[in-house]
Amino acid sequence: MELNKNYLTEEGLKQLEAELEHLIQVKRPAIIKLLQEARDQGDLSENADYDAAKAQQGEIETRIAEIQDILANVKLINESQTKKANKVTLGSTVEIYDYSSKTHEKYTIVGALEANPEEHRISNESPLAHAIYGRLVDDECDVVGIEVPYRVKIVKIINW
């Protein structure tokens, strides 16, 4: 994995591009209109509408800059390479057995921007992903870098 890259699935990339387009094409023009309307009210020193619109404009511009920075450093998770892999890699869905809790869990390894623990989508930067990355079915490893380390076994690898 390359450092300083934002790993995204094709779906994640499309979502970010759509958000950026919406911010630039819809939200930015709307806030500019609100600012103009607030300016037309006169004295800006005590104009709450102007202050609120200015704050909202700052949030929009910050998010636009964030997305542009993400897209400038994006690396797509290559679906065709993931399919061919027989080991855990970005995009893999992995079934593990946790020896400490005696449970089976499935996780998909995605870039940090798409991680969602509730959906069992874990960041490639997480301790679990670090422990299992590059490993094969039946490999056992220790998950460290957390308060209570634990041992897991890779039961199954599903590469899209």
UniProtKB/Swiss-Prot annotation:
Q: Name one GO biological process term.
A: regulation of DNA-templated transcription elongation
State the InterPro entries in the record: GreA/GreB_C_sf, TF_GreA/GreB_CS, Tscrpt_elong_fac_GreA, Tscrpt_elong_fac_GreA/B, Tscrpt_elong_fac_GreA/B_C, Tscrpt_elong_fac_GreA/B_fam, Tscrpt_elong_fac_GreA/B_N, Tscrpt_elong_fac_GreA/B_N_sf
Q: Which residues form a coiled coil?
A: 8-28
Keywords in alphabetical order: Coiled coil, DNA-binding, Transcription, Transcription regulation
Instruction: Give the top-rank taxon of the lineage listed in the UniProt record for this protein.
Output: Bacteria
MF annotations from Gene Ontology: DNA binding; RNA polymerase binding
Job of this protein: Necessary for efficient RNA polymerase transcription elongation past template-encoded arresting sites. The arresting sites in DNA have the property of trapping a certain fraction of elongating RNA polymerases that pass through, resulting in locked ternary complexes. Cleavage of the nascent transcript by cleavage factors such as GreA or GreB allows the resumption of elongation from the new 3'terminus. GreA releases sequences of 2 to 3 nucleotides.
What family does this belong to? Belongs to the GreA/GreB family.
- Identification of the protein by name: Transcription elongation factor GreA
Origin organism is Mycoplasma pneumoniae (strain ATCC 29342 / M129 / Subtype 1) (Mycoplasmoides pneumoniae)
